[in-house]
Amino acid sequence: MKERKVFDPIGALEQFLPQIGRTVNWNGWEIAVFRTSAGEVFALENRSPHPKGGPLAEGMVSGCFLYEPLHDWKIDLRTGLVQLPDQGQVLSFPVKVEGDQVYIAAPDVHPAST
């Protein structure tokens, strides 16, 4: 039987402006939260997959993709996968919006194991 995820509130939807990343500290994680122009909300670990990368919250959002701020790597906000020709993956967090609140759940790994 699959364990049910526990979602915790991280803020009001209005705090997450469209196409602008916002950093949230939650349960030992630094998370970059993004709201697309279509209103979808995504959360990724706020760490670039590039060896010399910086915080992802400073990146640019276009559709369901994030462009890493220092090296312009294209990252799928839905999966955390870096798009070709580059390679890598960013840890993504389950997100849900209920009413005017945004909730987040833990990924399948702990920060110490990443």
What does each model-identified segment do?
Residues 74:
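Short helix-to-coil "ATP-lid" hinge immediately C-terminal to the conserved N-box Asn in the Bergerat
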Residues 48, 68-71:
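Short cysteine clusters
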